[in-house]
Amino acid sequence: MTIFLGCGFAAKYREGGGNFSVPLQWMLGLRRLKLDAVWLELLPATDDLQADQARINNFQRQLRAHGLAGRYCLLYQKPAASTHELDAMRCIGMSKRTLLDRLAGPNVLLNLSYSIHAPFLSQFERRIFCDLDPSEIFYWMTKMELGQSSHDEFWTIGLNVHRNDCRLPKSSLRWKTFYPLADTRLLQPQSRPKLSKFTTIGQWYWGGAVEVAGEFPDLSKRVMFEPYLGLPARVPEAQFELAMNISPDDPERARLRQLGWHVIDPHRVARTPRSYRRYMASAFAEFTAIKGVDVAWQTGWLSDRAAAFLALGRPVITEDTGAARYLPRENGFRFIRNIDEAEMAVKDVLCDWAQLSKQARACAVEVFDSARNLRKILDL
């Protein structure tokens, strides 16, 4: 049986090592389970063919770096379209004939974030929808077709989806839950870093849209971090850093610097999956604020980045989305609701790093391990 990993967001963003790392955890987990897996990556063409070729080259280079050469088929779609016709795509890494032969036999598609669309979608035998962002997916499923009529199973990392306190838009689909994947064979625990650096990696500005109480609020990191920007003054013995896409001439940089935050370019420190892992390992812990709607709606969402930090033996300080109840009591997390709790959490990590680091790694192995979660999703 062939397991296809359907993805449409790794190749097109070649500066995003963290972005690429998401499907990478899935693929490495499938390999650990000794399954016949193929990474199926969709790359829509742009007007810049030279840039497209650079994206293709980078995608191939990253797969080779992780021992996955020959285990992928990149579907280059020219022109780009919201519908996916295999006849209109060029297959790279695997011939179209070989792909069709695989599709003719028993197969499963793990469709990450609805990356693969109809009519190509109908060629897979068993189609599993894997939701990585419940607040957006559940909201937009109430507005448009997002694969809800064309998949056999639906899985979400919204761990709290079935509880009464979860305020995600109602869905008639039978959702099952899984944890964000971290390949704990790739992500090994690292020694204590020299610096007490609390950091995170992400996008300071956000272009998405989710309606909350009739409005479309700004859910960017810029807004979500605002209540916590006084932390460097409260805990001067710690260093606070943000690997965020803030341009050098953006006034936000100067404002954050005045408040004690060091801003670094994520394209410099986390451009590849390897450098992304190295940057996380350089941290004492992760500190981050998350999309407010996940907190307000109590979705139970946790980030794949947090899972990776844990696997590396790095504690995580973040806001609670209702996910805490689905974790072991000792888990390496410190969940917070305001700056006072954040200050206490940072001081806890500074005082008890060794113990929290052990708890973080143990939780990653027990809960977030890629092979463990894939075994559950695929019912192995």
Model-derived regions, located:
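A structural signal for isolated positions on well-ordered beta-strands in alpha/beta enzyme cores
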Residues: V38, I128, E153, T199, ...
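Short loop/helix-cap segments at secondary-structure boundaries that form the rim of catalytic
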Residues: A118-F124, Q148, N164-P169, E252-Q258, ...
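Extended catalytic core of nucleotide-activated donor transferases of GT-like folds
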Residues: L5-D165, A270-S275, Y279, V295-W297
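Catalytic binding pocket for nucleotide-activated donors in carbohydrate/polymer assembly enzymes
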Residues: Y13-N19, L24-Q25, R31-A45, L219-R222, ...
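P-loop/Walker A phosphate-binding loop and immediately adjacent motor/lid segment at beta-alpha junctions
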Residues: L121-I128, S135, K170-Q188, L312-R314
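Structural alpha-beta junctions
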Residues: L28-D36, R61-Y72, S149-E153, W175, ...
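Short loop/turn segments at strand-loop or loop-helix junctions that form parts
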Residues: F4-A10, L40-P44, T200-G208, M244-N245, ...
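Conserved catalytic-core segment of nucleotide-activated headgroup transferases in glycan assembly
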Residues: D165-S282, V293
